[in-house]
Amino acid sequence: MEFRWFVQTNTTLFLVFTPKPRYEESFESMDNSTFANRWNLDEIESNYQTWLKEPASLDSRWQIFFEGFQLGYEGNGHQPTRTHSDSAEPEVGDYSIEKHARLYGAIYAYRDIGHTQGTFDPLKDEIPENPRLSLDRLGFEPKDLGEVHFTGNYLGGVRMTMKDILDRLKKTYCGNVGVEYLHLQATDKRRWIQSKIEPNDNQPSFSHDEKLRILRKIIQAEEFENFLHTRYVGQKRFSLEGGETLITALDSIFQKCPDEGVEEIVMGMAHRGRLNVLANVMGKSPEFIFREFSENFVPDGAHGSGDVKYHLGYESVRTTSSGQQVVIHLSSNPSHLEAVNGVVEGKARARQRLRGDSDRKRVLPILVHGDAAMAGQGVVAEVFNFSKLPGYRTGGTVHVVVNNQIGFTTDPTDARSSLYCTDVAKIVEAPIFHVNGNDPLAVAMVAELALAYRQKFGEDVVIDVNCYRKHGHNEADDPAFTQPILYQRIKKMPQVSELLTEKMIKEGDVTLEESEEIHKRLRRHLDASLEKVRTVKKSSTFEGSVAVHQIPYDFAPVQTAVKKKELEKVAQALTTCPRGFNLNSKIKRQIETKAKKFKSGRGIDWALAEQLAFGSLMLEGTPVRLSGQDSERGTFSHRHAVWYDSEDRTRYVPLLQMEDRQGKFCVYNSLLSEAAVLAFDYGYSLDYPRMLAIWEAQFGDFVNGAQVIIDQFIMSAEDKWGSVSDLVMLLPHGFEGQGPEHSSARLERFLQGCAEDNVVVVNLSTPAQYFHALRRQKRKEYAKPLIVMAPKSLLRHKLCVSELKEFTSGGFQEFITDPTPPKSPSTLVLCSGKVYYDLMEAREVIRSPKAAIVRVEQFYPFHEEKFKEVLGPFAKTKRLVWCQEEPKNMGAWNFLAPLIEESLGRRPEFVGRSATASPATGSLTLHKREQSELIASALGQTIPTSNK
């Protein structure tokens, strides 16, 4: 039980709760909405009488409350009243239960809302008074300040005057560090934070050497920005000026990592201050950074199109001041704010697996946010939601907010509806430390505390560095257009190093001459680096680069067939139910059917083919990760990768039961998110390439919820940054009359982004093809994302099956010729995916079919030579048709038509739905009519059935 504060009437004690205000200016207006939750004094008195007689019979929190009251009561000159006699009655004097409750209320109030009176905003000279923390509102009068009180759970339960208690509470909770933590439900976490900030009044305490290190680092950050500002006038660099203590925060975390057991950091951040972080945290050579500013700069051995300098990733091994090494990775990122967050979490999780870090203590993810993006971008909340989820947790992330209190030109009042930009972190009960960016020692203290919290509890924590932006959004921008008063104030702000130097001079930690010498030494170093750039023409591109150069894509066959005896091991595990396991009767029938099909070697469907691919890879030592909404069971109830006991819900994973030395199989039902989860799995695939990583959409239609991740990472990352991934995306796609939201994975959008062999895009028509495509991902010598237009109705289509021999021999086919072509066909129909079966079924009812049907299984990269070879026997057909279910402005038509024409010298005729704004009709009747017409048109026939 924790109290706010109490108000006494003649008969009732009120426990008062007040809603938190949106902004500091609204404290008084919000306070008018105060409501009281009435407590009858009899209940307190009754509990007190019980405590006097049998204290152990009460809840421990009541015991603490009454012990505190009793000690305080005695400490004010009263005689002890506690007795175990039935006639015991406490004498109620000046020091009453009510006053003790008010004291507890005051302590709680400062812990809860003390941050609203904090001095952590460097741009504010005066903090609006919060009336809820005034003496009278806390239930005291000036004459009470001299009374001695027992502090209960504050400061370990000591006796202090009310004045001393309030002074220390103000110093702790209303200073340059404001702490929000009472939203944490776990008592041990709240008490841990209290134990770290209350005994020292939340004030930094560093040794002489530590202070000098912090001073040197802040000077280093400032001199770097000053140098760029004067040497590269007007060039975009997204300066950190005004927020240089970001370097303090990151360096402090880095320095403490070895003490906390952290061996590796994976970090993500946007462009603001990125060059400074690269130079002064990551250790990237200033010489190389300066070289990138050259107008004629082209990296040696450049890969692809490249990207601007403040988007590039980097990795390094850094040595702390204590001589211990920490590996640091900075992820490449686009300008799309916060998009990299999920990627960082996935990379961190992958690196934890690589290190065998099951406790998730040795690899630390750090995310650097901007204040406007933190509150504005929905993916921030999605990534916070990873925090405690089995398939996505990373043992806690340290979030650092560069809160320069402006978003390009947007004020906080226009950027968010909450008091703080960090309020979103409360959804996972992350503690939040607001700190004054002009106080590097406080920033360093908070950074160390945040790291310790993460390591102790394995959960997220937020550092909100309140600072300012000295220039505009970029160096060519004039912020005075929209924030003239703010920037008049900013122009008068002293540099942080000046403030710290002044403080350290007063405390005898440095002299002005020593501080100036640090500045001079750093300037000389930067000048020397620039001189090298001007005189030395070449520099290694791969100094810390995260780019990966790989062999080009080629169409050489890949060995993907598997020996029958290996597949038998997989099938045995898939179709064996453990003794005593109460398996759902429907699943039991499914596995019995699977067993029969495998034994016969015929009728192997899509789900079984997938599991044979997974299992065979695992037997070869390749682990598999499958992640997505409902992926354990499968959206269409086809996979059942995990079984649950019908009586006690015991979990059983058949694919984990094959052999002792097999690869791992990790299948996770994801949170209901596309962007964050796809980003996570993409990041995972980057840093753990040994694993087959798969992300599955519930329906392909929903994949555009992750369009930023697709465009900025999956399709273009190799070209921009040399980032190599072989992530598989399963996107259920097909027109089956389910309406515009459950028909299309927007194939055309993926094909539009295809160039330079960046991805592989397939629309497969047989289970065996799917089997070989999955295995090919891990058996080829290059890595490319695989985008699969996955089936829905084909999962149970009687014709969409394969024979076992197709798995034990052969391999992937980019094109599949007609298995039963008519004699002398006059029409050649090219198609892909599900529509092939509609065409085949329709052709069966035609007496004298004249159309041959060839399937395109892989759209990109397009194997032109193989295409010509497969179509060779049909060169004399009079009519060449491309048939698709999608409207003309969608699907593969606009991508394939020019390729077909270039290969064959003939432009195909389009057969499909007319161009529409929406992918599909919502009417089942209209859908059937459209489907019937396009099938008939493709075959050059009228199909005699009402259902087509």
Task: Label each region the model flagged.
Residues 26-69, 73:
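Subset of Sec-pathway N-terminal targeting signals
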Residues 32, 69-246, 262:
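Extended, charge-enriched "interface" segments that sit outside catalytic cores
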Residues 98-108, 115-144, 148, 222, ...:
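Flexible, glycine-rich loop/tail regions that form catalytic "lids" or insertion modules at the edges
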Residues 202-224, 295-345, 349-356, 654, ...:
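Active-site cores of enzymes that catalyze phosphoryl transfer or operate on phosphate-rich substrates
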Residues 223, 227-287, 604-623:
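Active-site pocket-lining segments that scaffold enzyme catalytic pockets across diverse folds
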Residues 263-429, 433, 636-688:
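Cofactor-binding active-site loop characterized by glycine-rich and histidine/acidic residues
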Residues 407-418, 426-462, 467-471:
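Conserved phosphate-handling catalytic cores of large alpha/beta enzymes
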